[in-house]
Amino acid sequence: PQNFPRSDATDKTGYDGHIKFATEGSMQMHLAEQDFDVAARNGRHINPVERGHIAFRTDNIEAFKAHLSANGIEYADYGTAFAAEWHQIFFYDPEGNIIEVHQQVA
């Protein structure tokens, strides 16, 4: 079962795959069902559930997006397509790994 509010995503938009959680203290791992088409359905160039990613939380996602743009780093802004309470963006690190940065939204 999901333990966070999902957006009104369907199989045509957003992401409605199954997600499992493993928690140890303040650390949490999400195991998400692979979806090769989520980027295309959302008009984005990065697919965070194609091969996995690592995530970090921020208190100011707009400042983080401005920092990425100022440094010429492209990112995909999924907003709340995956989780109703989290604004998520994704970008590639220099090694080609997908990085997520998210902020809780009210």
PLM features: residue spans?
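Core segments of cupin and vicinal oxygen chelate
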Residues: 1-28
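Generic beta-structure capping elements
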Residues: 25, 32-34, 104
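Short, charged/polar, Gly/Pro-enriched secondary-structure boundary elements
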Residues: 26-29, 39-40, 96-98
